[in-house]
From Swiss-Prot:
Protein name: Proline dehydrogenase 1, mitochondrial
Listed result of changing R521Q: In HYRPRO1; likely benign; risk factor for SCZD4; decreased proline dehydrogenase activity
Keywords: Acetylation, Disease variant, FAD, Flavoprotein, Mitochondrion, Oxidoreductase, Proline metabolism, Schizophrenia, Transit peptide
Disulfide linkage: none
Gene3D superfamilies registered for this protein in UniProt: 3.20.20.220
Length: 600
């Protein structure tokens, strides 16, 4: 039973705190006070006043940039906003390489797109840029931006091969799998319709080991240049995605069963943390479905685990999955509508079990190295058919490594309809079990792909209906987490956004809640080459801000550069403002005779 053997390796050595208690923990945890200021000394240490942040002051926003860098930024962002050029950018790159030769082509790219969006070719060559950014208050999240250059056909073949089990290939697997959690040829190339997110395709276990080594080098490099660094990882880089698909389906169906029982008990439409099932009624339903005997059911729901409330919430129900499902023998999930237990697969092969265990071991190696180097590990969100498993495995790492402070950060995609439920459930779980909550909030990178897949395959669109609804969801999630930070001195969050309104909202709520930037508990993040008018004013005002910094050889990061160009096309409103500010600063330097400005 691979899951039951492997997950304990990610559990902390300290005792778990009442994993099935339905009594909500008090929100009143130690508040963040003056003593929380790094290096602040006594509890009566006085924080410095918070400087005002002006995102419209072009002179301050770009005082770290030389004039030729401003001109390059203006050129690149203008080209990225030219639809006709973007539509043919791959052909233009190919022709340029043929006409110029490799050496001149590399120079051209370093003078333009590569120089704007990529820090350098290796960890040594990027050091001057990292030091320069730190001098102006901006830190780095390192990412080795090299991608495998696969044709669409090669990507589709790899995806279908790695997401389909041996049992499904030979016809012995069940046909009752949820189609949302099955691989489909039409969406085999996961790069389609995706911007800003790197895509990994499974080749073999050796390739996964290679990805792990790359992440380890990033951790070491980040630890050398900063005592407050981050790196981002993707779990699809660390193992066969078949496991993520199947485990996601288990978790989704387990959660769906809980909500179906909630409907039966007249609690439809309630928020996740407000739904409380009567245990006696739930026991009756479980017994009728034949999921377990009466004796087993009574063993599940005891006074010791449930306390005196007589009710069970979604966290309590989810915690049962460790011991009630057997992934490697005969995994069954209850279907309340049919009244049947549905097997997902007959069994994992020995090789599949080993591959799953290796994925978890690689995660553990990275988390231990990050802990050793004092670097925070952000686990990136991915497609919704992988995400339940990714979030659950991240949670297991948080239980083990977030004991004293948040070293492992989960990512929450706020374009999802269930984003708020996901955030509130995890915050409450951290409270109950006593570990430190760490989160990165993003809008999401897979919108077009997710919508197209849901429409084509035939399941509910998981994405919020409008851009405004996504903004509202982001602010709702952020507000909830900031409220938690007010009462919990060990929780932290990264506001990963290029939206000025969202950043202003975060700053206003921080001021209202008494969250000082010197506490280093609210971080801000943007991509290298984008929204410097947000990043540098924040950094210069003392807020902890990070640039997502890719690096790698020119030819091997071209797929990354293609996405950066396409992303700027999709963010026309934001880049228009950025181009305006760049023009203002260039004209100011021209008028004042300061074209040879030296950053200081």
């Amino acid at each position: 039973m691979a899951l039951r053997r492997a997950l304990p390796a990610l559990r902390p050595c300290i005792p778990r705190f009442v994993p099935l208690s339905t009594a909500p923990a008090s929100r009143e945890q130690p508040a963040a006070g003056p003593a929380a200021v790094p290096g602040g000394g006594s509890a009566t240490a006085v924080r410095p006043p918070v400087p005002a942040v002006d995102f419209g002051n072009a002179q301050e926003a770009y005082r770290s940039r030389r004039t030729w860098e401003l001109a390059r930024s203006l050129l690149v962002l203008r080209l990225c906003a030219w639809p006709a050029l973007l539509a043919r950018h791959e052909q233009l790159l190919y022709v340029s390489r043929k006409l110029l030769g490799q050496r001149l082509f590399n120079k051209l790219m370093k003078m333009t797109f590569y120089g704007h969006f990529v820090a350098g070719e290796d960890q040594e060559s990027i050091q001057p840029l990292l030091r320069h950014y730190r001098a102006f208050g901006v830190s780095a999240i390192l990412d080795y931006g090299v991608e495998e250059d696969l044709s669409p056909e090669e990507a589709e073949h790899k995806e279908m091969e790695s997401c389909t089990s041996a049992a499904e290939r030979d016809g012995s697997g069940t046909n009752k799998r949820d189609k949302q959690y099955q691989a489909h040829w039409a969406f085999g190339d996961r790069r389609n319709g995706v911007i800003s997110a790197r895509t990994y395709f499974y080749a073999n276990e050796a390739k996964c080991d290679s990805h792990m080594e790359t992440f380890l080098r990033c951790i070491e490099a980040s630890g050398r240049v900063s005592d407050d660094g981050f790196i981002a990882i993707k779990l699809t880089a660390l193992g066969r995605p078949q496991f993520l698909l199947q485990f996601s389906e288990v978790l989704a169906k387990w959660r769906c069963f809980f909500h179906q029982m909630a409907v039966e008990q007249g609690q439809a439409g309630l928020a996740a943390m407000d739904t409380k099932l009567e245990v006696a009624v739930l026991q009756e339903s479980v017994a009728k479905l034949g999921i377990a005997s009466r004796a087993e059911i009574e063993d599940w729901f005891t006074a010791e685990t449930l306390g005196v409330s007589g009710t069970m919430d979604l966290l309590d129900w989810s915690s049962l999955i460790d011991s009630r499902t057997k992934l490697s023998k005969h995994l069954v999930v209850p279907n309340a509508q049919t009244g049947q237990l549905e097997p997902l697969l007959s069994r994992f092969t020995e090789e599949e079990e080993l591959q799953m265990t290796r994925m978890l071991q690689r995660m553990d190696v990275l988390a231990k190295k990050a802990t050793e180097m004092g670097v925070r590990l952000m686990v990136d969100a991915e497609q919704t058919y992988f995400q339940p498993a990714i979030s659950r495995l991240t949670l297991e790492m948080q239980r083990k490594f977030n004991v004293e402070k948040p070293l492992i950060f989960n990512t929450y995609q706020c374009y999802l309809k269930d984003a708020y439920d996901n955030v509130t459930l995890d915050v409450e779980l951290a409270r109950r079990e006593g570990w430190c909550f760490g989160a990165k909030l993003v809008r999401g990178a897979y919108l077009a792909q997710e919508r197209a897949r849901a429409a084509e395959i035939g399941y509910e669109d998981p994405i919020n209906p409008t851009y405004e609804a996504t903004n509202a969801m982001y602010h709702r999630c952020l507000d909830y987490v900031l409220e938690e930070l007010k009462h919990n001195a060990k929780a932290k969050v990264m506001v990963a956004s290029h939206n000025e309104d969202t950043v202003r909202f975060a700053l206003r709520r921080m001021e209202e809640l008494g969250l000082h930037p010197a506490d280093h508990r609210v971080y801000f993040g943007q991509l290298l080459g984008m929204c410097d008018q947000i990043s540098f004013p924040l950094g210069q005002a003392g807020y902890p801000v990070y640039k997502y910094v890719p690096y790698g050889p020119v030819m091997e990061v071209l797929p990354y550069l293609s996405r950066r160009a396409l992303e700027n096309s999709s963010l026309m409103k934001g880049t228009h403002r950025e181009r305006q500010l760049l023009w203002l600063e260039l004209l100011r330097r021209l008028r004042t005779g300061n074209l040879f400005h030296r950053p200081a």
